[in-house]
């Protein structure tokens, strides 16, 4: 079932940081394949792009020295995962679900981490003004407000 597969991918992605490094590398590879399969089933599900976005951003942010070590020790991380693709996939998720504040917040985090505070501010403002429809969105609204305070807004 598609929904079960998607939920398993999301759960696996959320727990990746708790795994030993070698297992993290292998799990990233598996997750990329699983998400590509899910996209083939439903190319309009924003959750697929959301997970793919985070994988790209996280792996793309890893310093080259660590990626080199991963290639020697564990067979390497997928080379196609980049910070820019992470940003692009999050924008795609937003285009498919423009009323979901979580995506705006996370894209704001990406921009903040890559040294673009003005872009981050705009996205945190958007995240804080969208009416929350889920418990998760209420949490992210508060987080967006905190980020805006940190940015002096």
What are these regions (language model features)?
Residues 1-6, 117:
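Short, charge-rich amphipathic alpha-helical segments embedded
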Residues 1-2, 45, 100, 134:
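Residue-level recognition of tetratricopeptide repeat
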Residues 8, 15, 52, 106-107, ...:
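Structural register within alpha-helical repeat arrays
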Residues 8-44, 54-95, 132-133, 137-139:
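Short coil/linker segments at helix-helix boundaries
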Residues 14, 58, 113, 147-150:
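Register position in tetratricopeptide repeats
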Residues 84-123:
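Glycine/small-residue-rich hydrophobic helix-like segments
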Residues 116-153:
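A cross-kingdom marker for long, charged
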